Amino acid sequence: SLVGGVLISLVCLRQTDLKALIAYSSVAHMGIVLSGLLTMTYWGLTGSYALMIAHGLCSSGLFCLANISYERMGSRSLLINKGLLNFMPTLSLWWFLLCSGNMAAPPTLNLLGEISLLNSIVSWSWITMIMLSFLSFFSAAYSLYLFAYSQHGKIYSGVYFFSVGTTREFLLLMLHWLPLNLLILKSNFCMLWIYLNSLKKMLICGVNDMKLFILDRELFS
């Protein structure tokens, strides 16, 4: 899964379609999630759960931004969606915040998930550090590639007007970004399902022990 994540990251660096790049970045992140799950450790499970929540928010926000650009430019190609800092300056901040979240920059929940996953995967085998270093580097590379190529450079010559975002779009992006950054302050919510699962197992074991105790008393009475 780590090798697959590195290969998909290389594919991301060759994409010229906004939505394809974001979709491939999701596949690359799921490579490290799968590795963490396969270690079958506590940190692996909690890190995978946290990263899936974080990437669900971050990836959804990036898809939203890609759709906003598509509605105005009429194309998803990076060859046309460039120079957006001049065309849509009000949305450039959101591109930066969500692209930095996609590369697990602090204080996003992605950072917490990746630290937990790195801990679990390296504890399973130190050789995985090689692939993890490549995966982390290329994750930052394609996130910066997405932001720099779309926001900077000369604006597409077929565009002759200036565009601003609407209140609905800003609210939608804010509701993606706020949980992504605030959940790290209360990260035990991300581990809640593990606590509930452990409590369920304890209750089942307690009920089974009680049944055995009652059965033993009936046999010896």
From Swiss-Prot:
Its EC number is 7.1.1.2. Keywords: Electron transport, Membrane, Mitochondrion, NAD, Respiratory chain, Translocase, Transmembrane, Transmembrane helix, Transport, Ubiquinone. It is found in: Mitochondrion membrane. InterPro entries: NADH_UbQ_OxRdtase, ND/Mrp_TM. It comes from the Eukaryota. GO terms for cellular component: mitochondrial membrane. This is NADH-ubiquinone oxidoreductase chain 4. It comes from Anopheles arabiensis (Mosquito).
